[in-house]
From Swiss-Prot:
Subunit annotation: Homotetramer.
Organism: Influenza A virus (strain A/Wilson-Smith/1933 H1N1)
Pfam name, any one: Neur
Description of activity control: Inhibited by the neuraminidase inhibitors zanamivir (Relenza) and oseltamivir (Tamiflu). These drugs interfere with the release of progeny virus from infected cells and are effective against all influenza strains. Resistance to neuraminidase inhibitors is quite rare.
Higher taxonomy: Viruses, Riboviria, Orthornavirae, Negarnaviricota, Polyploviricotina
Region annotated Involved in apical transport and lipid raft association, chain positions: 11-33
The protein's name: Neuraminidase
Further details from the record: The influenza A genome consist of 8 RNA segments. Genetic variation of hemagglutinin and/or neuraminidase genes results in the emergence of new influenza strains. The mechanism of variation can be the result of point mutations or the result of genetic reassortment between segments of two different strains.
Family affiliation: Belongs to the glycosyl hydrolase 34 family.
Length: 453
C-alpha cells in the first residue's frame, strides 16, 4: 500500500469513528431531553387502567393530603402520662446555634406535631441575647420546628412577627395568630398557610394578647380567645371563630367577676373547653366552654387542689375564684373528665419550680382537696414555667378518641440566674391507658455560659 493509500485509509477510518461518535452524542442529547420533558411536563396525569381512568394531581413541594379535623371525639381514657418529647434547647445552645425563646407550645396536624415558639431575634451565647427578659419587642417572632428538636436557624420556619401568639391546623392548613405592635395599639395578624387573611386591632388599647398555646379546630372552624385590658383587674375577653383565616363570628364574654388570660383550649365531642389564668384574684383556674355557635358557659375549677401559682396550700376550694394568693399567676391547663379533672401545676406553691399531674376524681364539681393520683415530671429543685394543653386527633393517631397531651416550659436565665439572657426549653407528655413513671426531666443546662462571664 503506497503512502497515498495509507493516508486515505486512515482518513476514512477517522471519519467513520467521528460520525459514530457524533451519532452517539446526538442520541444522548435526545435521551436527556426526553427524560427532562417527562419530569417537568404537565403534572396532572391521566392514566387508563382496565378501562378505568385514574387522575393523579401532583403538587410540587407540598403534601396535598388534606382532611377536615372534626374534633367530635371524646378524650381518650387515660391512667397517666408518657414522655412525648424533650428538646434540650438550652444545653445544645451552649455550643450550637439555638434561638433565645420563650412561650413555646406544641400543636399537631393530622400528619405531624410541631413546636411553636416566640424568638427574641437572637441566639444563645451571643451578645444579642442581652436583655431578653423583656416580653414585648419588635424583634420577637413566632417560628416553628419539628417537635423534639432544638429550635435553630437551620430547622425552623418563620410564621409571624409576634410577641403573643397561637397556631392550629384544621386538617387543610395552618392558622397562625401573631400579635405585635405598641401596648396601646397592638394588632393581631391572622395567616392561613402563610398568607395574611385578616387583622384584629386592640379594642381596649391595653396590651392585646392571646393564648400562647394552640387554638382549637372543630369541623373546619378554628377558635381562639383574646384578652385586652388590665392584668390585675377586670378586662375584656373575646372568642373568635375563624374559617380559613377569616373571622366569621366573635363574642365578648359577660364575666364581670372572672379573669381570663393565656387560655389552654382543646376540643371535646364537638365543643371547645378552655382552662385559663386568673391574674386578678383567683388561685384556682377559670374555665369557659363553648359550642360552634359560640354559646358559652363559664366557671372556675371547684377542686381544693389549686392549679395556679402562686397559690395557698391545698384546702377548701370554690366554684368561684379563690382569693387567697389570687393575684398574679402562670399559664396552665387542666383536662375535664366528667366530674373529674386532671390538674397540671408547679410543685412549688410560690415559685415556678417543679411540675406534677394530679387526678381529682370529683374536682370539677366538688370543693374538697382529696385526690387519687399524683405523677411527678419535674422535681421541686428544678425550674419550670408556663404549661399548656395540646391534643392529637384520631386522624393522626389512628385511635377512636382524642389523645390529651401537655407541654411544660423550662425557663432558664434571668431573673433567677446570673446570665444576661432569659430563654427556655420544652418537654411534653401524652395521656396513655397503660403504665407510666414518676421522674424528673429538667432542663439540665449548666450555667453561666461564656457570654455571661
Amino acid at each position: 500500500m503506497n503512502p497515498n493509500q495509507k493516508i486515505i485509509t486512515i482518513g476514512s477510518i477517522c471519519m467513520v469513528v467521528g460520525i459514530i461518535s457524533l451519532i452517539l452524542q446526538i442520541g444522548n442529547i435526545i435521551s436527556i431531553w426526553i427524560s427532562h420533558s417527562i419530569q417537568t411536563g404537565n403534572q396532572n396525569h391521566t392514566g387508563i387502567c382496565n378501562q378505568g381512568i385514574i387522575t393523579y394531581n401532583v403538587v410540587a413541594g407540598q403534601d396535598s393530603t388534606s382532611v377536615i379535623l372534626t374534633g367530635n371525639s371524646s378524650l381518650c381514657p387515660i391512667r397517666g402520662w408518657a414522655i412525648h418529647s424533650k428538646d434540650n434547647g438550652i444545653r445544645i445552645g451552649s455550643k450550637g446555634d439555638v434561638f433565645v425563646i420563650r412561650e413555646p407550645f406544641i400543636s399537631c396536624s393530622h400528619l405531624e406535631c410541631r413546636t411553636f415558639f416566640l424568638t427574641q431575634g437572637a441566639l444563645l451565647n451571643d451578645k444579642h441575647s442581652n436583655g431578653t427578659v423583656k416580653d414585648r419587642s419588635p424583634y420577637r417572632a413566632l417560628m416553628s420546628c419539628p417537635v423534639g428538636e432544638a429550635p435553630s436557624p437551620y430547622n425552623s420556619r418563620f410564621e409571624s412577627v409576634a410577641w403573643s401568639a397561637s397556631a392550629c391546623h384544621d386538617g387543610m392548613g395552618w392558622l397562625t395568630i401573631g400579635i405585635s405592635g405598641p401596648d396601646n395599639g397592638a394588632v393581631a395578624v391572622l395567616k392561613y398557610n402563610g398568607i395574611i387573611t385578616e387583622t384584629i386591632k386592640s379594642w381596649r388599647k391595653k396590651i392585646l394578647r392571646t393564648q400562647e398555646s394552640e387554638c382549637t379546630c372543630v369541623n373546619g372552624s378554628c377558635f381562639t380567645i383574646m384578652t385586652d385590658g388590665p392584668s390585675n383587674g377586670l378586662a375584656s375577653y373575646k372568642i373568635f371563630k375563624i374559617e380559613k383565616g377569616k373571622v366569621t363570628k366573635s363574642i365578648e364574654l359577660n364575666a364581670p367577676n372572672s379573669h381570663y388570660e393565656e387560655c389552654s383550649c382543646y376540643p371535646d365531642t364537638g365543643k371547645v373547653m378552655c382552662v385559663c389564668r386568673d391574674n386578678w384574684h383567683g388561685s384556682n383556674r377559670p374555665w369557659v366552654s363553648f359550642d360552634q355557635n359560640l354559646d358559652y358557659q363559664i366557671g372556675y375549677i371547684c377542686s381544693g387542689v389549686f392549679g395556679d401559682n402562686p397559690r395557698p396550700k391545698d384546702g377548701p376550694g370554690s366554684c368561684g375564684p379563690v382569693s387567697a394568693d389570687g393575684a398574679n399567676g402562670v399559664k396552665g391547663f387542666s383536662y375535664r373528665y366528667g366530674n373529674g379533672v386532671w390538674i397540671g401545676r408547679t410543685k412549688s406553691d410560690s415559685s415556678r419550680h417543679g411540675f406534677e399531674m394530679i387526678w381529682d376524681p370529683n374536682g370539677w364539681t366538688e370543693t374538697d382537696s382529696r385526690f387519687s393520683v399524683r405523677q411527678d415530671v419535674v422535681a421541686m429543685t428544678d425550674r419550670s414555667g408556663y404549661s399548656g394543653s395540646f391534643v392529637q386527633h384520631p386522624e393522626l393517631t389512628g385511635l377512636d378518641c382524642m389523645r390529651p397531651c401537655f407541654w411544660v416550659e423550662l425557663i432558664r436565665g434571668r431573673p433567677e440566674e446570673e446570665t444576661i439572657w432569659t430563654s427556655g426549653s420544652i418537654i411534653s407528655f401524652c395521656g396513655v391507658n397503660s403504665d407510666t413513671v414518676d421522674w424528673s426531666w429538667p432542663d439540665g443546662a449548666e450555667l453561666p455560659f461564656t457570654i455571661d462571664k
